[in-house]
UniProtKB/Swiss-Prot annotation:
Pathway assignment: Lipid metabolism; fatty acid metabolism
UniProt keyword Flavoprotein, yes or no: yes
Root EC class: oxidoreductase
Record's subunit section: Homotetramer.
Motif segment (Microbody targeting signal): 361-363
UniProt-recorded Gene Ontology molecular function terms: (S)-2-hydroxy-acid oxidase activity; FMN binding
Gene symbol of the encoding locus: GLO4
Main location: other
PANTHER family: PEROXISOMAL (S)-2-HYDROXYACID OXIDASE GLO4, S -2-HYDROXY-ACID OXIDASE-RELATED
Identification of the protein by name: Peroxisomal (S)-2-hydroxyacid oxidase GLO4
Biological processes per GO annotation: defense response to bacterium; fatty acid metabolic process; hydrogen peroxide biosynthetic process
Keyword Metal-binding found: no
Length: 363
């Protein structure tokens, strides 16, 4: 594993290790996959404005999220069904997160139970949720998470319906029975045609979910609530108005609406609307420590890593996940040093130049 030097190499190992159905499920995006590619490429169009002759002999990457200290502004995004990638599933991912002193957001669609993840290691973790048509199911899971010591709820708000993921349709992707829901609802679908995941989502997810439901969620939990899946100023303002505790700028890993903007291109729009009132996080397309720096320079408090974590898990289990996080942290530390930023607070908007700024400078 010492010879693996970047996320792309982990992706190639994951492709070799996984059955095609599972690799395509993790890796694929919606329809033409334009946004999937753009999430990554948009980062590459942002250039640095490094400062020199700054004392960077000691680099401090540490920060906090909702008051919980983390070793770097790199957290684990919620991704579904980790046991499809590795037999130990979310438990392996959780242990790696704990070893790296960061926060894992456990997926509502996890293959290990909330209690199994909670008892696997001592760490701060959040729970991502969907709201089902059967609200009692969502409520039970939230209450179990609270009891198990989870520290926040992350409500995904961009899935009134599942996006059209053509690889899953072609592969007849199965939806396995998830242990969290045993005795509550059947999640298993083995389709003769189409995607089983889409079939399950259509039957279970509540398409009537609206801003007023933040109140309902507040009524069933005392935990902080973040909303994940915002891409516009308008929705950011509504989120603040609804009293949420944080926002994740996300296009669901480009798995929902193709031709949605790359998240890094709309981050500033959301940050300017929020005006520092609540934390803004970002996911989508982060593949390098340089990407982490760019997101922070444009106003994010932290980034969430999705697919790279699954690639590490599929390739090398817990050690693979840890290696992915450590690589990104190392790249980020180098970027801070070479940009003249000894601490997170030193990373500013002046340290990057966006594509729009480059074009304007040529006019």
């Amino acid at each position: 594993m010492d010879q693996i030097v970047n996320v792309d190499e982990f992706q190639e190992l994951a492709k070799q290790a996984l059955p095609k159905m599972y690799y395509d499920f993790y890796n694929g995006g919606a329809e033409d996959q334009h946004t999937l590619n753009e999430n990554v490429q948009a980062f590459r169009r942002i250039m640095f404005r490094p400062r020199v002759l700054v004392d960077v002999s000691n680099i401090d990457m540490s920060t906090s999220m909702l008051g919980y200290p983390i070793s770097a502004p790199i957290m684990i995004a919620p991704t579904a069904m980790h046991k499809l990638a590795h037999p130990k599933g979310e438990i392996a991912t959780a242990k790696a997160a704990a070893a790296c002193n960061t926060i894992m957001i456990v997926s509502f669609m996890s293959t290990c139970t909330i209690e199994e993840v909670a008892s696997s290691c001592n760490a701060v973790r959040f729970l991502q949720i969907y709201v089902y048509k059967r609200r009692d199911v969502t409520a039970q899971i939230v209450k179990r998470a609270e009891k198990a010591g989870f520290k926040a709820i992350v409500l995904t708000v961009d899935v009134p319906r599942l996006g059209r993921r053509e690889a899953d349709i072609k592969n007849k992707m199965i939806s396995p029975q998830l242990k969290n829901f045993e005795g509550l609802v059947s999640t298993e679908v083995r389709p003769n045609e189409g995607s089983g995941v889409e079939a399950f989502a259509s039957s279970a997810f509540d398409a009537s979910l609206s801003w007023k439901d933040i109140e309902w969620l507040r009524s069933i939990t005392k935990l902080p609530i973040l909303v994940k899946g915002l891409l516009t100023r308008e929705d950011a303002l509504k989120a603040v108005e609804a009293g949420v505790d944080g926002i994740v700028v996300s296009n669901h890993g480009a798995r929902q609406l193709d031709y949605s903007p790359a998240t890094i291109t709309v981050l500033e729009e959301v940050v300017h609307a929020v005006k520092g009132r609540i934390p803004v996080l970002l996911d989508g397309g982060v593949r390098r420590g340089t990407d982490v720096f760019k997101a922070l320079a444009l106003g994010a408090q932290a980034v969430l890593i999705g697919r790279p974590i699954v690639y590490g898990l599929a390739a090398k289990g817990e050690d693979g996940v840890k290696k992915v996080i450590d690589m990104l942290k190392n790249e980020f530390e180098i970027t801070m040093a070479l940009s003249g930023c000894p601490t997170i607070d030193d990373v500013t908007r002046n340290h990057v130049r966006t594509e729009n700024e480059r074009i304007k400078s040529m006019l």
